[in-house]
């Protein structure tokens, strides 16, 4: 019998399992963590497994863009999940940061799969240590820069506050894009602006168009290293129901893909995709869309590295 008797454990897109080796340009990093404090929707810690599972439906070639085996061109690997305990950020965050540093030090771009939005902080810290002058492009329906209580600093509403205050990113050139919906308190946008962030609400984004908006961001950052944080609740719950904090009036799947493709040319050095919560998902919709967005990001990375056409 020619076919192997056993299948390997499930990895994203069936990638080889392990740490990046020579020539690897991308390393998928599962971050099965949530703070466990949402009053209604807990479960993003199961996001990495769900996204990997739904990635079985993603094909490796895109005949309209490059027509190449992009994961193979990137020599991408799935590093597995960071060994952490959900609900304990003070213990988990240094381990997440160390895991991301191991990918960065191997010369690869870490692609984090969360996990709730809090995972972005240790990943940004790692990227900021290796890429001075890091700026963030935060695609989300929420700003996630609420005031941080010194006694309980880490939660999925404060990661960009902490990143700005800790110097992991330069908030003066970092943008929140896609912001919409109701909030628990007043003054949310004023706080973002006081920290230095540019806020692009979803109505402005759609009115100006993705290309023009991202071109303005690219001109502002001037080739500086970019951390891409993609919160899946930027999508409308109609296409991504299984997220931690859904907000109506979001992007369609087609719009999200178009926005991702508009990022071509940015110097993205690390990224994460967060907030998939399988317990609230319907038929794997949010997890499957997240898997597709990661595949789109890999295509974007291959293009930036000049690998398309090399296969």
Where in the sequence are the language-model features?
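Conserved alpha-helical scaffold segments that buttress catalytic/binding sites
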Residues: 2-311
